[in-house]
Amino acid sequence: MGLAEAKYRAARAFVMEAMSAVEDELTGNEDLPSAKTTQDARLACVHGANECMELVDLLHNTAGTTGMRMYSPLERKLRDAHGAATHRCAALPLYEDLGAILLGNEPSPEFAGGAGAPVGPRPGKS
């Protein structure tokens, strides 16, 4: 349980730090976060979702057969965590895309932040 708590807190801290940077840019004069902030936020989300999936697996395995019964709250959390971690926004292949950017490759528009293709003005901004 101690390992699970430490991994959870570390992943949560990374996500909160990255999302705080996004919020800071958006509450400033930016319509979109910068490329670096976008990339950091995506990396934090991928890491957070996959860490949570591993944590739920750990707890599910610790619970034994009790955890796999349909009435068990762990069973539902296992499905939810696996569903979230395999979603396109958090899937493991994104580590490869983000790693390539960290090694100096040009980011695709998905990771370019405000430097990417224009998406139009945000509501409430002109």
What are these regions (language model features)?
Residues 1-25:
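Extended amphipathic alpha-helical segments enriched in small hydrophobics
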Residues 2-9, 42, 46-53, 79-82:
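Generic structural signal for well-ordered, non-transmembrane alpha-helical segments
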Residues 13-16, 20, 53, 57-61, ...:
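Charged/polar positions within long, soluble alpha-helices
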Residues 22-39:
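Flexible internal linker/loop segments at domain or repeat junctions
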Residues 24, 28, 61-65, 87:
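General structural signal for alpha-helix termini and helix-helix connectors
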Residues 36-67, 74:
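Charged, glycine-rich active-site and insertion segments that engage polyanionic ligands
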Residues 65-126:
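Glycine-rich phosphate/cofactor-binding loops in nucleotide/flavin-utilizing enzymes
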